[in-house]
UniProtKB/Swiss-Prot annotation:
Location of the protein in the cell: Cellular thylakoid membrane
Organism: Synechococcus sp. (strain CC9311)
GO cellular component, one term: proton-transporting ATP synthase complex
Gene3D superfamilies linked to this entry: ATP synthase, F0 complex, subunit A
Record-given protein name: ATP synthase subunit a
Signal peptide: none
A Pfam family that the UniProt record links to this protein: ATP-synt_A
Family stated for the protein in its record: Belongs to the ATPase A chain family.
Transmembrane feature ranges: 30-50, 89-109, 128-148, 193-213, 214-234
Length: 241
């Protein structure tokens, strides 16, 4: 018996047009792969430039990279703890940098210059597939962290302080990736749509404040995602966090 008088396939819900790559029976969003690798390539190039001639008196790209490293290190240490944060620092740093570069790249890079057969390039984090994939990756990291350090005792936290908490703890595990993915996706997509509408209606001065606000929001969203990822991992590692 159907609960609704219509069907609503989630896979058919889209915003805008997309370039698809057909691999067997699987449809891949081609423009997301393209924009992701362009941004990853730009990030790697910046890192290579910043670490080419290391100096004790850092300047330019090296100075910025060292600032980011110190910031991510402090964030990871605060959320995960002094004992375990070093082994998770590359993971948290990669998440933060990819999201930050993706968010800012979607706002600053003139993607429309690159023409595609269908659809257009944009911020990878404005696509729900990207944010859900990263949220699930954080969830897997959370379970791996807990099981690798505590073994099966990890699941004791689901019945602490009382077994009555079990259903609530299970629901919480589903809400974690949902909140991570939809918060990031919704904010970045809304920013892109707002800027796009304003540029179309008032193409000169008015969109600039909104674009600047979008850059600030994009940086905050990267920070929130990385902080929550580190917190969840720390929660899985410690008896009480």
């Amino acid at each position: 018996m159907a609960l609704l008088p219509f069907t609503l396939p989630l896979a058919e819900l889209e915003v805008g047009h997309h370039l698809y790559w057909q691999i067997g029976n699987l449809n891949l969003h081609g423009q997301i792969f393209l924009s992701s690798w362009i941004l990853i390539g730009a990030l790697l190039a910046f890192v290579l430039v910043g670490t080419k001639n290391l100096s004790r008196d850092p300047k330019g790209a090296q100075n910025l990279l060292e600032f980011l490293w110190d910031y991510i290190r402090d964030l990871s240490r605060d959320q995960i703890g002094e004992k375990y944060y070093r082994e998770w620092l590359p993971f948290i740093g990669t998440l933060f940098l990819f999201i930050f570069v993706s968010n800012w790249g979607g706002a600053l890079i003139p993607w429309k210059v690159i023409e595609l057969p269908e659809g257009e390039l944009g911020a990878p984090t404005a696509d729900i597939n990207t944010t859900v994939a990263m949220a699930l990756l954080v969830t897997l990291a959370y379970f791996y962290a807990g099981l690798s350090k505590k073994g099966w005792r990890f699941f004791e936290l689901y019945v602490e302080p009382t077994p009555i908490m079990l259903p609530f703890k299970i629901i919480e595990e589903f809400t974690k990736p949902l909140s991570l993915s939809f918060r990031l996706f919704g904010n970045i997509l809304a920013d892109e749509l707002a800027v796009g509408v304003l540029v179309y209606l008032v193409p000169l001065i008015v969109p600039l404040p909104v674009m600047l606000l979008g850059l600030f929001t994009s940086a905050i969203q990267a920070l929130i995602f990385a902080t929550l990822a580190a917190f969840y991992i720390g929660e899985g590692l410690h008896e009480a966090h």
